[in-house]
């Protein structure tokens, strides 16, 4: 760059900083420009690896959607528990009024420190979310769910009244306000969403999410979570087989998948994932029904090995650390070009 252009740029930067404050524009090579993306573990080793950075990114909007009883709230409660383990503060905006504190505690959530709000209207829920984010003291905010964010006009109106596009407009306006604050405060905001069917769709998927299109654009990560089968012990069903697809990812390559078990009353079976990934990556040897680690037999059959790892958390952590070290990128994560799956809105 020639001297005149350098002087012109320096003058422009000085003027911008004078008018809008120091740090309003900076070079990415400067010390103040943060390039590494911090992540919070999801509680699932396979999903952490599928997300490419070891969890959900901080300072971003996340959307988790899926059918009923697929594990959406369970997954967010695990994220809250992992954040609290690192000394973080978490908030749960319970628009559905369906949070089970006993179940949350079983998943490792510290209910004493968890901030819970049960708002009356969608506007109130999103205003509370914005204020928590702007405080800069909250690490994770979960909104459960977008479908339950009822606009004030709808609550005050009659049951049969038509309110076309009200929720979509509410979400669009809220996300415009929220996004900048979320980035500045480095808070992770997770929206849980439900699925609806579009009528008259001949080709492609008839499924869509509620609340319009805005969330699809503003979300850095979108996770599609599905129940794929039942886990049985004899005739008794003790859990769900779950599959999560990373539909959109702005911080790592998208379209990866993770499969894990959700056990009733326990949540995500981390030990089950460690066994599967340990065998796949060669850290655990499987010979017939026997499993071995570092030359020592640790059990016959997956259930026995799972129990062994539950009783010996040190070994489980050592195997997990080796898997993460091998499969997760070292150093800073640079975001690739966005890849999105366009879906028309119901609104």
Swiss-Prot record:
Binding site for ATP: 66-73
Gene3D superfamilies for this protein: P-loop containing nucleotide triphosphate hydrolases
GO cellular component: cytosol
Keyword match Metal-binding: no
A single GO BP: SOS response
Protein localization: Cytoplasm
Major localization listed first in the record, in broad terms: cytoplasm
Pfam families reported for this sequence: RecA, RecA_C
InterPro entries per the UniProt record, alphabetical: AAA+_ATPase (IPR003593), DNA_recomb/repair_RecA (IPR013765), DNA_recomb/repair_RecA_CS (IPR020584), P-loop_NTPase (IPR027417), RecA-like_C (IPR049261), RecA-like_N (IPR049428), RecA_ATP-bd (IPR020588), RecA_C_sf (IPR023400)
DNA repair in keyword set: yes
Sorted UniProt keywords: ATP-binding, Cytoplasm, DNA damage, DNA recombination, DNA repair, DNA-binding, Nucleotide-binding, SOS response
Superkingdom assignment: Bacteria
GO molecular function: ATP binding; ATP hydrolysis activity; ATP-dependent DNA damage sensor activity; damaged DNA binding; single-stranded DNA binding
Similarity remark: Belongs to the RecA family.
NCBIfam families reported in the protein's UniProt record: tigrfam_recA
Role played: Can catalyze the hydrolysis of ATP in the presence of single-stranded DNA, the ATP-dependent uptake of single-stranded DNA by duplex DNA, and the ATP-dependent hybridization of homologous single-stranded DNAs. It interacts with LexA causing its activation and leading to its autocatalytic cleavage.
Protein name per Swiss-Prot or TrEMBL: Protein RecA
Organism for this UniProt entry: Allochromatium vinosum (Chromatium vinosum)
Encoding gene per record: recA
